[in-house]
Amino acid sequence: MRIGLYPGTFDPITLGHIDIIRRATLLVDRLVIGVAINRDKGPLFDLEERVAMIEAECAKLTEQTGTEIVVHPFENLLIDCARDVGAQVIVRGLRAVADFEYEFQMVGMNRALDDSIETVFLMAEARHQAIASKLVKEISRLGGDVSKFVTPLVRERLAERLGQR
């Protein structure tokens, strides 16, 4: 069984993330969505909320693709998480050259730690290249319309959290 790991903070999950997840399901039999517990980032949504939103959105994808999608929180090194879930490949999304520079360094470090686990990059579709969770939160916080960047469920959660009812 081919197992892939798509890691991220997903605070919140965006249409860009969902697009990468959908496309990653074409490459593996089981896709683990690794939700990073990154206390330094000070997430808007706690871990349970992020996991719930991801599970809700991925349930639809599982039905459409037939690929098993599992959500797995982690706080350890990414390469250790990959080992823990039995992943042979780490999936990363790229939006721009700036993403590549960071990801290139990460691949080098991960390969030094375990060269049996590959990393593959999926380029964001053009319509999703500008989407970043940080920007979505800022737009929502300032009262802007984020419907082009997130699902209705996530838009509703953002409005609730930021008191925009």
UniProtKB/Swiss-Prot annotation:
Q: Which GO terms fall under molecular function for this chain's record?
A: ATP binding; pantetheine-phosphate adenylyltransferase activity
The annotated site for Transition state stabilizer falls at: 17
Q: Which Pfam families match?
A: CTP_transf_like
EC id: 2.7.7.3
* Keyword Phosphoprotein part of the UniProt annotation: no
Q: Which cofactor does it need?
A: Mg(2+)
Q: Which residues bind ATP?
A: 9-10, 17, 93-95, 103, 128-134
Annotated substrate binding lies at 9, 41, 78, 92
Query: Which InterPro entries does this entry report, sorted A to Z?
Result: Cyt_trans-like, PPAT, Rossmann-like_a/b/a_fold
Give any Gene Ontology cellular component: cytoplasm
What this chain does, per the entry, is described as: Reversibly transfers an adenylyl group from ATP to 4'-phosphopantetheine, yielding dephospho-CoA (dPCoA) and pyrophosphate.
Q: Which HAMAP family match?
A: PPAT_bact
Q: How does it assemble?
A: Homohexamer.
The UniProt similarity line reads:
Belongs to the bacterial CoaD family.
Q: What is this protein called?
A: Phosphopantetheine adenylyltransferase
Could you tell me which species this protein originates from? Answer: Ruegeria sp. (strain TM1040)
Originating gene: coaD
